[in-house]
């Protein structure tokens, strides 16, 4: 037994050293910002142009970054196991699609969960229930500064009529698990930041 541990130790130390080197290497890969300027700023779009230097020494004189506030999306499920979806037109792809309730974290929101609760109530009129965050992801890590906080809310119920903002034109739909599965399998849900948490939730709950 003693010989086994003696024989194992060098390999363990080598692996530990490898992890340390890998972590250091990852830390050293961060780009250096040489200069930065805003090229567009308004309510819905803030674009920044950076001049950056890579760890290799190469310089990219024009690297464009889009600054956004944090986003939220919610898998809301009623007490009778129906999924709360909305259906709306998305001008970017020119299509009307089923989506989860989602939105932006406002400065007045105390937390991403508070923002998600507000968005669910405003868009669908549903609220209450038990909430947990399932993942935090990036829609485009190479060019966007924000993250999407993804929640699951179970046992939600209709507490009021929707309070949709001007410019919002959507309808509320309650879908069964089979209908959600079908949407996913047929690639009918186009928002990547909604597809990811849906697959994760269904996988964790062994519903696929």
Go through the PLM ranges and name each one.
Residues 7, 14, 18-21:
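Short, positively charged and aromatic/hydrophobic N-terminal segments
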Residues 23-31, 96, 133, 142-145, ...:
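Nudix hydrolase/Nudix homology domain
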Residues 1-11:
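Hydrophobic alpha-helical membrane-insertion segments
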Residues 48-56, 140-159:
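Active-site-adjacent beta-strand/loop module that shapes the phosphate/pyrophosphate-binding cleft
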Residues 18-42:
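Extreme N-terminal tail/first-helix region
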Residues 23, 28-30, 63-68, 73-118, ...:
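Conserved Nudix-box catalytic region and its N-terminal flanking loop in Nudix hydrolases
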Residues 49-53, 76, 152-154, 174-176, ...:
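Short, well-ordered beta-strand micro-motif
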Residues 35-73, 79:
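Acidic, metal-coordinating catalytic segment for phosphate/diphosphate chemistry
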């Amino acid at each position: 037994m003693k010989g086994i541990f003696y024989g194992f130790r060098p390999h363990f130390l080598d692996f530990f050293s490898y992890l340390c080197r890998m972590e250091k290497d990852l830390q050293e890969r961060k780009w250096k910002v040489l200069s930065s300027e805003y090229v567009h700023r308004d309510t819905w779009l803030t674009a920044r142009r950076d001049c950056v230097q890579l760890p290799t020494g190469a310089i990219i004189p024009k690297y464009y970054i889009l600054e956004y506030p944090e986003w939220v999306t919610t898998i809301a499920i009623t007490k009778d196991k129906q999924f709360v979806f909305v259906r709306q037109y998305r001008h970017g792809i020119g299509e009307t699609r089923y989506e989860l309730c989602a939105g932006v974290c406002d400065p007045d929101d105390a937390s991403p969960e508070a923002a998600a609760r507000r968005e669910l109530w405003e868009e669908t009129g549903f609220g209450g229930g038990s909430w947990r965050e399932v993942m935090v992801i990036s829609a485009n890590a190479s060019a966007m500064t924000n993250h999407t906080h993804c929640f699951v809310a179970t046992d939600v119920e209709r507490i009021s009529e929707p309070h949709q903002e001007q410019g919002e034109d959507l309808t509320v739909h309650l879908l069964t698990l089979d209908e959600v599965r079908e949407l996913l399998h047929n690639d009918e849900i186009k928002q990547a930041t909604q597809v990811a948490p849906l697959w994760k939730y269904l996988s964790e709950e062994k519903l696929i």
